[in-house]
Amino acid sequence: MSETAEKAIEIWKIRRLVKQLINCHGNGTSMITLIIPPGEQISRYSNMLAEEYGTASNIKSRVNRLSVLSAITSTRERLKLYNKVPDNGLVIYCGEVIMEGNKTRKLNIDFEPFKPINTSQYLCDNKFHTEALAELLESDQRFGFIVMDGHQTLYGVVSGSAREVLQRFTVDLPKKHGRGGQSALRFARLRDEKRHNYVRKVAEGAVQHFITDDKPNVAGIVLAGSADFKTELGQSDLFDQRLQSRIIKTVDVSYGGDAGFNQAIELAADTLSNVKYVQEKKLIQRFFDEISLDSGKYCFGVVDTMNALQEGAVETLLCFADLDMIRYEFKNSEGNPVITYMTKEQEEKDSTNSFLLDKDTGAEMELVSSMLLSEWLAEHYKDYGANLEFVSDRSQEGMQFVKGFGGIGAVMRYQLDLSMLDPESDEFYSDSD
């Protein structure tokens, strides 16, 4: 599996972790956030935590004091696992989290981020602080688009899986005049002046949208449009030199506005090949192509996809990043494992909890583990020799994959008759749900 794809999975894990941590709350100031940037000394932070322990011993509230001391102790224990700060820095979260029914649970997490985190932070609060992680996620490459023709201009950005229109405006330029003589010269001057002012306005808008704190805020700029407006803009002295150096592609499009923006993204695909939005469309399109060819080298829905994975037949597994599917592993009365997949909605509808019962004996099975299927896949996909790609529903193809195919499917290495396999969880899951 490529380094880029593995990094994408690490990013997905952090994104999901941030979502979970944001919803965690505690009593008092017993939730610790510790972020250590690359190049720092572990000993410095060990000494700092020792001092913090002494200070926390003076907290008047007994309950809060014990909680804070416990969190500091857990943080120190986590820190001892490292001889030095990892290359990308170190992030530690420790503390007691309030669960449903006002119960508390200790949460201790330590990890190296997927890229350097240049923040030093130590906070005791009633929540975990994830702002620094959120910044890491947001700082994926952004590409600016200017779609310009004789009727309108659109500014947009593509970053990761997202495309966003920043601004659009229309323009009313005079058409070429058919008369001759002085009248023609006058109209030509007027037309050139309005065209010049239009290019100036577009250039000024580019600075407004693509420069922040005197620096370009995009990794590259794509100029798109019909006629020669886009070329004129790129070569004009009116176009900011800082942005001129960021032009990576100029493309001809048949439309203006949103349609032109979408076409420009497609035409610039090779240049933007590292942008997740484009990669995602290509991945899902390959899946759709296999279906169109009726090649037999595809599957979709959780039951068929997981069976194909177990058989080692999956080359590339596609999974909706926010798939609401839980993987339950039970042990039946004979000690054999039973795997069941259910959405939270299906579980809520199952008022009798029939999914907990052995379908042969009716006896309640022993629960071994339960976790989101997406998280299980992120941990185990390599065991089956598969590539794993998380996709969003932000593109048209992604939306179709989620709505029409259940948000999980695969391109297979070879044809496999899935009807010959015995899907243990078929009783509890319908691909149409």
Swiss-Prot record:
GO terms for molecular function: GTPase regulator activity; sequence-specific mRNA binding; translation release factor activity, codon specific. Coiled coil: none annotated. It is found in: Cytoplasm. Keywords: Cytoplasm, Methylation, Phosphoprotein, Protein biosynthesis. The modification N5-methylglutamine is found at Q182. It comes from the Eukaryota. GO terms for cellular component: cytosol; translation release factor complex. Changing S292A: Does not affect interaction with sup35/eRF3. Changing I291A: Reduced interaction with sup35/eRF3. Gene3D superfamilies: 3.30.1330.30, eRF1 domain 1, eRF1 domain 2. The modification Phosphoserine is found at S425. One of its GO terms (biological process) is cytoplasmic translational termination. Component of the eRF1-eRF3-GTP ternary complex, a ternary complex that mediates translation termination in response to the termination codons. The eRF1-eRF3-GTP complex binds to a stop codon in the ribosomal A-site. Sup45/eRF1 is responsible for stop codon recognition and inducing hydrolysis of peptidyl-tRNA. Following GTP hydrolysis by sup35/eRF3, sup35/eRF3 dissociates, permitting sup45/eRF1 to accommodate fully in the A-site. Belongs to the eukaryotic release factor 1 family. Component of the eRF1-eRF3-GTP ternary complex, composed of sup45/eRF1, sup35/eRF3 and GTP. This is Eukaryotic peptide chain release factor subunit 1.
